[in-house]
């Protein structure tokens, strides 16, 4: 019996060694942790339960039958983050460069199936050279099996991808279908075709970092939701994100202890809005002063900065935040911000996370670039996302809410539950200057008369009270009481029940 137990320990030690000490050292020299080191940092200490440690590939071509390491280049299992269950796979670059084989894919599919059955998130730590060429079509089939599970799990359990090394070719499509993608600066990259292929086909010379590095995907392509300096920071931030999220669409997000007064008065908010209507201010200041303990987890902060998305807590409960940012493009909606916010709203709705919308939007960004790029359909995505959402929705208009953008930003007409406005709010078809130039075109030559007309328009329409008279605004509130009013609103909506008409699925304007 003793010999059998010792053999088990020996086999485990070999499996845990991955590709061997030399390759582990090479991994460390690149500034990267190993697959198992990453899992140890991600999960609560001692909570990891591994599956399929001894699985080996079945390929016999190209001499592969003589090289069959245990685990086949991926570590899979489950554990806990702050006591809550998650499933995880971590690709091992020290074994065949983390390349995906048939059995490698089967290990990933197994934990994804278990995650869906048991209602727990899946976190993928990606560090792979792509498909294992020696296995040919079997490797491609493995990718497709994973893709299908990504699709089936979408909206059922949170899926998080962390790119911690190469992720190229077919490998990119699995992360692309997950809810969140995060990257590590300087050591990770994602692209469908690499620099060599790009050069061959287009004669364009580009580095892997320029083509698919963290900066590219967080600032330009919007493929990634965030980037971190190293593996340790990335894994810490993933733990923090998971703490905001429900385990599945069948369970609520966790309620965490809070020590912040719900009725806290923030007098500084009474002077947040500048006297000059064209002067910007930082909407993040309002978000931080509403949130419990000023804790805000921002999503896609480096992309489409004219709109802010992320998570806060109110009375310990998770709330998704969408807010126009007057500091960038005056808070205008455009193609990128509409796509960014629409995807975030749909995630929140899929997982029953209430949505707080903070509005200061002068309209949609004009220009041929926007029109040629399809701003009509992209803007409709955000409109569609808000309109179909059945979760509690609370909206606060701080300053401008003009034209169609007013409708889009979680207005009362899109089944907003509580729609508040500050006294500084201006809810109108357009600003006073544009309106008077259209309404009183014949008087444009008389500057004094036009100025008087503009002042008349401002007094009559550029305020929250016309909308409040019609019931489109539930209450005009004092800025300093925003946290209290918003918290009370969400508290009253905890038992909200709202269902959309039965359909196979919607047809959002993609």
Swiss-Prot record:
Pathway: Metabolic intermediate metabolism; propanoyl-CoA degradation; succinyl-CoA from propanoyl-CoA: step 1/3. Its EC number is 6.4.1.3. It holds the Pfam family Carboxyl_trans. Residues 1-257 form the CoA carboxyltransferase N-terminal domain. Gene3D superfamilies: 2-enoyl-CoA Hydratase, Chain A, domain 1. It catalyses: propanoyl-CoA + hydrogencarbonate + ATP = (S)-methylmalonyl-CoA + ADP + phosphate + H(+). It comes from the Bacteria. Residues 264-504 form the CoA carboxyltransferase C-terminal domain. Induction: Transcriptionally regulated by PccR. Expression is dependent on the carbon source supplied: transcript levels from acetate- and propionate-grown cells increase 6- and 10-fold, respectively, when compared with succinate-grown cells. Keywords: ATP-binding, Ligase, Nucleotide-binding. GO terms for molecular function: ATP binding; propionyl-CoA carboxylase activity. Residues 1-504 are annotated as: Carboxyltransferase. InterPro entries: AccD/PCCB, AcCoA_carboxyl_beta, ClpP/crotonase-like_dom_sf, COA_CT_C, COA_CT_N. The keyword Cell cycle does not apply. The keyword ATP-binding applies. Probably a dodecamer composed of six biotin-containing alpha subunits and six beta subunits. Belongs to the AccD/PCCB family. This is Propionyl-CoA carboxylase beta chain.
């Amino acid at each position: 019996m003793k010999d059998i137990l010792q053999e088990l320990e020996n086999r485990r030690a070999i499996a845990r060694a991955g590709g061997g000490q030399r390759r582990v050292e090479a991994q460390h020299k690149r500034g990267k942790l190993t697959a198992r080191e990453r899992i140890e940092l991600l999960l609560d200490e001692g909570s990891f339960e591994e599956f399929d440690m001894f699985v080996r590939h079945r390929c016999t071509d190209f001499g592969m039958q003589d090289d069959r390491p245990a685990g086949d280049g991926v570590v899979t299992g489950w554990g806990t983050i702050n006591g809550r269950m998650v499933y995880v796979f971590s690709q091992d670059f020290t074994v065949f460069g983390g390349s995906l084989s048939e059995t490698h894919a089967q290990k990933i599919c197994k934990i994804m199936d278990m995650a869906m059955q048991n209602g727990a998130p899946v976190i993928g730590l990606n560090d792979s050279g792509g498909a294992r060429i020696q296995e040919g079509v079997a490797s491609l089939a493995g990718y497709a099996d994973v893709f299908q599970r990504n699709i089936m799990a979408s909206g059922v359990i949170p899926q998080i991808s962390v790119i911690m090394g190469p992720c190229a070719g077919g490998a990119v499509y699995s992360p692309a279908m997950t809810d969140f993608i995060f990257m590590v600066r300087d050591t990770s990259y994602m692209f469908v075709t690499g620099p060599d292929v790009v050069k061959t086909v287009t004669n364009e010379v580009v580095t892997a970092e320029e083509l698919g590095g963290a900066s590219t995907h967080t600032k330009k392509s919007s493929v990634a939701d965030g980037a971190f300096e190293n593996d340790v920071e990335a894994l810490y931030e993933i733990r923090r994100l998971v703490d905001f999220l429900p385990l599945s669409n069948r369970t609520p997000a966790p309620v965490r202890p809070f020590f912040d007064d719900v009725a806290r008065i923030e007098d500084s908010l009474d002077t947040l809005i500048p006297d000059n209507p064209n002067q910007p201010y930082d909407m993040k200041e309002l978000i931080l002063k509403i949130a419990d303990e000023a804790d805000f987890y921002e999503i896609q902060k480096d992309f489409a900065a004219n709109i802010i998305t992320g998570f806060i807590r109110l009375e310990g409960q998770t709330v998704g935040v969408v807010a126009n940012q007057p500091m960038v493009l005056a808070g205008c909606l455009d193609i990128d911000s509409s796509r960014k916010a629409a995807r975030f709203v749909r995630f929140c709705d899929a997982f029953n996370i209430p949505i707080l919308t903070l509005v200061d939007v002068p309209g949609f960004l004009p220009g041929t670039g926007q029109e040629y790029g399809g701003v009509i359909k992209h803007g409709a995505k955000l409109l569609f996302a808000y309109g179909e959402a059945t979760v509690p929705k609370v909206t606060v208009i701080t300053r401008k809410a003009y034209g169609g953008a007013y409708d889009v930003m979680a207005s009362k007409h899109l089944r907003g539950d509580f729609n508040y406005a500050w006294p500084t709010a201006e809810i109108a078809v357009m600003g006073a200057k544009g309106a008077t130039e259209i309404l009183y075109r014949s008087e444009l030559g008389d500057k004094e008369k036009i100025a008087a007309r503009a002042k008349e328009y401002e007094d009559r329409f550029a305020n929250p009270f016309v909308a409040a008279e019609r019931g489109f605004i539930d209450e005009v509130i004092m800025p300093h009481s925003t946290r209290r009013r918003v918290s009370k609103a969400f508290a009253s909506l905890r038992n909200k029940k709202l269902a959309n008409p039965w359909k196979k699925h919607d047809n959002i304007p993609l």
